[in-house]
Design a protein with these regions (language model features):
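A short glycine-rich, Lys/Arg-flanked "PGG" loop and its adjoining helix->strand segment in the class I
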Residues: 130-142
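Class I S-adenosyl-L-methionine
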Residues: 155-184
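Conserved beta-strand signature within the Rossmann-like core of class I S-adenosyl-L-methionine
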Residues: 142-151
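Conserved glycine-rich SAM-binding loop
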Residues: 15-17
Length: 184
């Protein structure tokens, strides 16, 4: 029997690892035999350490209104107020340092087919955001997928055009409305 494998995925600006662990949990739950790795990068060494530690307090978990009890049971081992990512999920992640503003980003982290760069670029000034997104786009293999959020719409539009990216419109209105409701 052939084992299905997925090329490494990448999260930039991984913070405490919650997005990367969520992706791993969903992949593992929907494709149990799938072999995959998620490389999670951040510039804050404390956040990298926190993510690699895979342990969260109850408040961190229940601070998110869209998280379900089913997801929590599948993803965490729970002991009192400590929620630890299950070993079978944790084993799919590698945490390390990388800076999206570094022009050698591709040399540091390598090319990728799936990149998540969400909710960190909006902290940057326009020129830095443009440079970061250019560096991120340089990571993309042909036909790669880039998930980006939290960036100025004009910068995103210009760089999407410059890098010949095709915006995904599948269920875009539904996704947008659900995200707005979750933030409310």
């Amino acid at each position: 029997q052939q084992v299905e494998a997925f090329k490494p995925l990448m999260t930039l600006g991984c913070s405490n690892g919650s997005e990367a662990y969520t992706i791993a949990s969903v992949l593992k739950g929907s494709r149990p035999g799938l072999k995959f790795t998620i490389n999670a990068f951040d510039i804050d060494r404390k956040m990298i350490e926190k993510g690699a530690g895979a342990s969260y307090r109850r408040e961190e978990i229940y601070n998110n209104r869209v998280i379900t009890d089913s997801f929590i049971r599948k993803t965490f081992d729970m002991e009192k107020d400590t929620f630890t990512i299950k070993k079978g999920i944790r084993s799919h992640l590698k945490f390390d340092y990388a800076d999206a503003l570094d022009n050698r980003l591709k040399e540091t982290v390598g090319p990728c087919d799936v990149v998540f760069a969400q909710n960190f670029i909006f902290h940057m000034k326009r020129d830095a955001a443009r440079r970061a997104l250019n560096n991120i786009c340089a990571l993309l293999n042909p036909r790669a997928a880039l998930f980006v959020d939290g960036i100025d719409i004009d910068i995103r539009r210009r760089l999407t055009k410059r890098h010949n990216l095709a915006p995904l419109t599948y269920k875009i209105e539904e996704i947008h409305n659900e995200a707005r409701m979750a933030r409310a």
